[in-house]
Amino acid sequence: MATKVTIQDIANELQLSRNTVSKAINNTGVLADATREKILRKAAEMGYKQFAYLPLFQEDAAKTAESSILPSGKREIAMLTTQFLSSSHFSSMMPDRFQSEIDHLHSYMTIHRISPIELKEKKLPSSLNIQHTAGIICFEVFDYDYAQMLCDLDVPLLFVDTPVMEMRPPLKADRLYMENRIEIQNAVAHMVQRGKKRISFAGDKNHCQSFFERYMAYKDAVEHFGLTEGLSTCAMPSGQQNYPVSLYETIRRFKTMPDAFVCANDFVAMDLVKALDELGYSVPDDIWVCGFDDSQEASYFAPHLTSIHIHGQIMGYTAANLLMTRIEEPSLNYRTVYTETNLILRESTGD
């Protein structure tokens, strides 16, 4: 059995710190582009986690093609992403389950990263051969015009999360989301029940549809409880490359700090906790913080982070079902599916 490649193995190979390698793979923190690219290339070369998926099952596919629902000559299920998927619970477990579900179809899954230039010029990744592609699944594809270009390819297509869709024509594709509203509102209710009155939001609400839905769920909840003063201290810097610094500068200007923050995801929450600490505020003693995703980091971050758990296995199973049924029945009406999430209370909200 092959030895599992770890972040420390990659760090040793490149003579870098484990923390630096983790930042590159998880797309957190600030790194020079050249350093990030070097780490990601080495991760793919060494077969780290999802990077080892390229490609699988090609030999068997040719032998058993007749039993597959896939069109003749099209064996590839292409995963497109604007960045390598992190090792957080959701984005590492979902592709694993997705791949296990498509194995019996005698297909193989490939992962293609959309470069910034390809994104800007609305071009497919150079590594993708569309003539051999039976279907496409998209992660972290949040540019609306690029998403529309993919919809025009006439290839079965599934988006896992999408660009913000408010006041825009719908995408002609199936869409899969995690449930973003219910547990955000439960988190706000929990804070209110424990005496928190000034509750704010942190994160770029326009980053993607899920972030937008989380913000709207937060806003609806504080308005429901009549506690709208927290709306004036939401920390929502947008389009910033150096997000932790932008977040710090945003909250540093607040004349009054909130009692609690609901965050767009765990990495925003962790950046926020660090910024608050630099400003002399303790979490949870002074301010409560809730994340979203329930990433692996959430359970060992200090303080342990209250978060909203995404069921990666269920997301992967549902994604496979949506894409395979689209391949089998291309004329189906487009579907939008949400999967359950759950609030996990931990130390950052005094639990």
What kind of region is each of these model predictions?
Residues 1-65:
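N-terminal helix-turn-helix DNA-binding module of bacterial transcription factors
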Residues 89-105, 183-186, 209-229, 271, ...:
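Short, solvent-exposed amphipathic alpha-helices that sit
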Residues 139-183, 267, 293-305:
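Flexible loop/hinge segments that line or gate small-molecule binding clefts
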Residues 174-202, 241-249, 269, 310-328:
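Hydrophobic alpha-helical segments within soluble ligand-binding/sensing domains
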Residues 185-227, 335-350:
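An alpha-beta-alpha
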Residues 248-351:
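Flexible loop/turn connectors
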